[in-house]
Amino acid sequence: MKIAVDAMGGDNAPQAIVEGVMLAKQDFPDIEFQLYGKEAEIKKYITDEKNITIIHTDEKIASDDEPVKAIRRKKTASMVLAAQAVKNGEADAIFSAGNTGALLAAGLFIVGRIKNVERPGLMSTLPVMGEPDKGFDMLDLGANADNKPEHLVQYAVLGSFYAEKVRNVQNPRVGLLNNGTEETKGSELTKKAFELLAADETINFVGNVEARELLNGVADVVVTDGFTGNAVLKSIEGTAMNMMSLLKTAILSEGVKGKMGALLLKNALHGMKDEMDYSKHGGAVLFGLKAPVIKTHGATGPDAVRYTIRQIHTMLETQVVPQLVEYYEGKAE
């Protein structure tokens, strides 16, 4: 299997990206990595050249570039070349920590969506508290700001497919994010989506779920519109960061006693931090495209890159995308 890597994407590129690839090489000797970017800079961090190909380019897409314009005008940008490699069959998947909007555009306009998938969704696997090996898939997280009820139903299908094939969740429970659990709650969008989801016998729909319940594992797949999903994701990220910051401040404010207490609780505190770190589940997938297109956080480090490559390996190994293509071809007949 071959993975096209945008080595210049992200705040810490290319160092964090290449170091993460070096870690992943130890886990997956069957992967061939294509690193797109400035060859001289990339080579600084390569410790083993086996299964590594560098495709040199001086051009990259910046974090503040307008996504669609950047994809169209910067034809030799590292991200664009990586996406083209997937389109041309020279690579099986693309990974980037760069401009999210540009990667979404590259995924849609270059890699292409699966026939009969109207709106591919941006999806992440988020943690379930108290169960570190478990998680839930949530989409859409920002690929589509405006959605129709039918899109949310399609997200339920996409999320269920991923949960079952990639995360090995049998008959995944699907929840609709809403401002209350009652059937009558919500906007016109969620009310209509509720009706459609409840009527679809192929979806294991468990009803409305509230944001406060998400991390308790109330559902295996949570669907929502892209605007709401993105806001909820950032709220979860912000809450996690602030909790750790508050805890640190409280400990330091107690002086020596606080530091001694923290030392005694060191393992528990590390466990708490790890449990809230959803990067262990990999990156965000733009699911519904003809190949895996994966995005990680711009400030990602080597470990997060390693986890994301593990995720891509699983997606390719389980052939989840070809199975999804077959599923939608069958629905069209």
From Swiss-Prot:
| HAMAP family documented for this protein | PlsX
Fill in the subunit field for this protein: Homodimer. Probably interacts with PlsY.
Annotated gene: plsX
Q: Which UniProt keywords apply?
A: Cytoplasm, Lipid biosynthesis, Lipid metabolism, Phospholipid biosynthesis, Phospholipid metabolism, Transferase
Q: Give the record's GO CC terms.
A: cytoplasm
Q: What is this protein called?
A: Phosphate acyltransferase
Q: Which organism is it from?
A: Enterococcus faecalis (strain ATCC 700802 / V583)
Question: Which residues are in coiled coils?
Answer: none
Q: What class of enzyme is it?
A: transferase
Molecular function terms, GO-annotated: phosphate:acyl-[acyl carrier protein] acyltransferase activity
| The keyword Lyase belongs to this UniProt entry's keyword annotation | no
Pfam families recorded for this chain? FA_synthesis
E.C. code: 2.3.1.274
UniProt subcellular location? Cytoplasm
What role is this protein assigned?
Answer: Catalyzes the reversible formation of acyl-phosphate (acyl-PO(4)) from acyl-[acyl-carrier-protein] (acyl-ACP). This enzyme utilizes acyl-ACP as fatty acyl donor, but not acyl-CoA.
Q: One biological process GO term for this chain?
A: fatty acid biosynthetic process
Which family does the entry's similarity section mention? Belongs to the PlsX family.
Its annotated pathway reads: Lipid metabolism; phospholipid metabolism
Reaction(s) catalysed (UniProt annotation) = a fatty acyl-[ACP] + phosphate = an acyl phosphate + holo-[ACP]
